[in-house]
């Protein structure tokens, strides 16, 4: 039997597709079940450094050195404004807008803009509001307005921009629109606070910062993009304050962060992309006591360094017409769902996983999924074709020699090779509903000696469906030109046999795992139970893999065979595990 999970090296010759050690950080499934290697995303971002000139810069005076309003420059030290009182500047750092309707505003140094009433800044051939470094002062732009006031900024280039930080505060509404570039762009950090609303619409990015983006706001922040990201943070993205954040992009990620993504404090975040992942991050994602709704193409959520959902409500959708789809995925780290979280993940594609993690590196500790005291629904299937229901590729498999393999779909999937510890899926006191056209739940470990075994552990919960369902073992061996690869893991299924194919009829395509309080066995007439007794269905179960030495499965390893039906589908499961791919390119900046 050919190995199910390995990808051959260039010089290997085998009848199947199988796993070997990947030599790149990011990988993807091929439509026919094998892997192609792609380079890991190289993020092009600003590198912050102190220059000699900044070290020698004299102490700042915290005031704009000059301002330019509608094409006329005014120097510091003298107050300025128009006769109608629609704008005024105190000659230092404070500017007031009250019914302003005019051209671009620019300043050197620090500028505080407060607005009242309805204000409009327009520039069809440049930036709207721009602050740059002065000769003796770094750029900083602060914008604030009251609840009944609006600031509209429309321009061809960046609408609101600063070489340094941008701070938006207050209860007013800021509408920033760029027809060719970013709506809001900072060379430093972007911070949005208060209770107001911010609507940023850019042809490039909606909201972008070379530093951190912090949204600590109880109002609504909307960031829309066409070519690039809705929200683009070259460092960390922090969302808190209990408000609503809606990010979207047509051609790119709705949300991208080169650092960590943290969502908390009752915030409600919605991210959607029409052509790419909804959320893409180079580090970790943490959602604590907040809600997140993400919908993307190829990926719903993809981050490299772990996902933690703590008291969170998360809905994720990923689709791909005939291709690869992964709803909730992390590479090289763990997925932790805990403390009353509710997670609903759906992936539709020829090769798809709803919740998945993978780890292929010996110095990394990831590749595990931990679910405790939570409710999780994970469904992976092939996209519907307009008929009565979705096409279930795995249902097309039969006992023919070398049948055509058309796809693979797994609800919850963990995979490791060379990791510090083997793949583990742990379910504790939780309700888990998992469905996959191929398998509902699968844990897989690969090694050169067969000692690493992927495990499924269930504690404080019971397998309700399928009837007679249990954790069953998977074993396979692939003989490659450079040595043998052993694949060992577990899945949910029926029977006592050790399987060597995910398409085995013993594998459960749908499973429901529930804590004791959700099991209500029928009471027989006249039956009484002693106080404190438990029904059979409420017994706590814990299942782990047997030790490699002396285990009942020792010696039951499928050998490579040219006529094996598993040979054609061999790499499909593997590819699904690292579905996290797609060639991600550097974002060019103007």
Which residues make up each language-model segment?
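A composition-driven surface/loop motif
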Residues: 5, 60-518
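C-terminal low-complexity, Ser/Thr- and acidic/Pro-rich disordered "stalk" regions positioned immediately N-terminal
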Residues: 501-562
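Intrinsically disordered, low-complexity polyampholyte segments enriched for Lys and acidic residues
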Residues: 9-13, 21-23, 217, 289, ...
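Sec-dependent signal peptide cleavage junction
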Residues: 56-66, 558-566, 586
């Amino acid at each position: 039997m050919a190995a199910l999970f390995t990808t051959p090296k260039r010089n290997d010759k085998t009848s199947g597709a199988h796993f070997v050690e990947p030599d790149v950080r990011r990988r993807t499934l091929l439509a026919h079940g094998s892997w192609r290697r792609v380079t890991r995303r190289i993020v092009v971002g600003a590198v912050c450094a102190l220059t000699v000139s900044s070290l020698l810069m004299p102490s700042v005076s915290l005031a704009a050195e000059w301002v330019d309003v509608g094409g006329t420059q005014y120097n510091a030290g003298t107050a300025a404004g128009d006769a109608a009182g629609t704008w005024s500047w105190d000659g230092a750092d404070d500017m007031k807008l009250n019914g302003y309707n005019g051209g671009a505003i620019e300043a050197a140094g620090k500028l505080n803009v407060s607005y009242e009433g309805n204000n409009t800044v327009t520039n069809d051939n440049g930036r709207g509001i721009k602050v740059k470094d002065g000769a003796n002062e770094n750029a900083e732009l602060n914008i604030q307005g009251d609840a009944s006031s609006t600031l509209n900024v429309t321009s061809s280039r960046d609408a609101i921009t600063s070489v340094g930080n941008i701070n938006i505060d207050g209860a007013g509404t800021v509408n920033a629109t760029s027809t060719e570039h970013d709506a809001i762009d900072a060379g430093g950090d972007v911070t949005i606070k208060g209770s107001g609303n911010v609507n940023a619409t850019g042809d490039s990015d909606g909201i972008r910062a070379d530093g951190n983006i912090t949204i600590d706001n109880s109002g609504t922040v909307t960031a829309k993009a066409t070519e690039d990201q809705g929200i683009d943070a070259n460092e960390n993205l922090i969302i808190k304050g209990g408000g609503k954040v809606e990010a979207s992009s047509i051609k790119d990620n709705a949300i991208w962060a080169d650092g960590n993504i943290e969502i908390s404090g009752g915030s409600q975040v919605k991210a959607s992309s029409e052509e790419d992942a909804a959320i893409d991050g180079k580090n970790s994602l943490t959602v604590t006591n907040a809600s997140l709704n993400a919908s993307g193409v190829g990926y719903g959520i993809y981050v490299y360094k772990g996902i933690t959902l703590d008291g969170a409500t998360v809905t994720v959708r990923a689709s791909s017409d005939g291709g690869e789809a992964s709803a909730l995925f992390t590479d090289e780290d763990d997925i932790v769902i805990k403390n009353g979280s509710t997670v609903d993940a759906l992936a539709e594609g020829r090769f798809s996983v709803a919740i998945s993690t993978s780890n292929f590196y010996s110095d990394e500790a990831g590749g595990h999924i931990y679910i405790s005291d939570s409710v999780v629904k994970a469904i992976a299937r092939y996209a519907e074709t307009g008929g009565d229901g979705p096409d279930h590729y795995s249902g097309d498999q039969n006992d023919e020699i070398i049948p055509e393999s058309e796809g693979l779909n797994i609800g919850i999937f963990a995979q490791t090779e060379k990791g510090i510890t083997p793949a583990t899926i742990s379910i504790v006191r939780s309700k888990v509903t998992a469905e996959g056209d191929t398998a509902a739940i699968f844990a897989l470990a690969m090694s050169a000696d067969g000692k690493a075994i992927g495990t499924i552990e269930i504690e404080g919960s019971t397998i309700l469906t399928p009837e007679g369902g249990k954790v069953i073992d998977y074993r396979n061996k692939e003989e490659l030109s450079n040595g043998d690869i052993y694949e060992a893991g577990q899945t949910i299924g029926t029977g006592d046999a050790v399987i060597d194919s995910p398409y085995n009829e013993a594998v459960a395509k749908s499973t429901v795992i529930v804590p004791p309080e959700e099991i209500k066995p029928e009471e027989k007439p006249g039956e009484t139970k002693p106080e404190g007794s438990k029904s059979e269905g409420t017994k706590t179960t814990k299942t782990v893999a047997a030790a490699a030495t002396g285990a009942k499965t020792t010696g039951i390893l499928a050998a490579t065979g040219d006529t094996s039906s598993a040979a054609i589908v061999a790499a499909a499961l593997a590819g699904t595990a690292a579905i996290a791919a797609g060639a991600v390119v550097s974002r060019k900046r103007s």
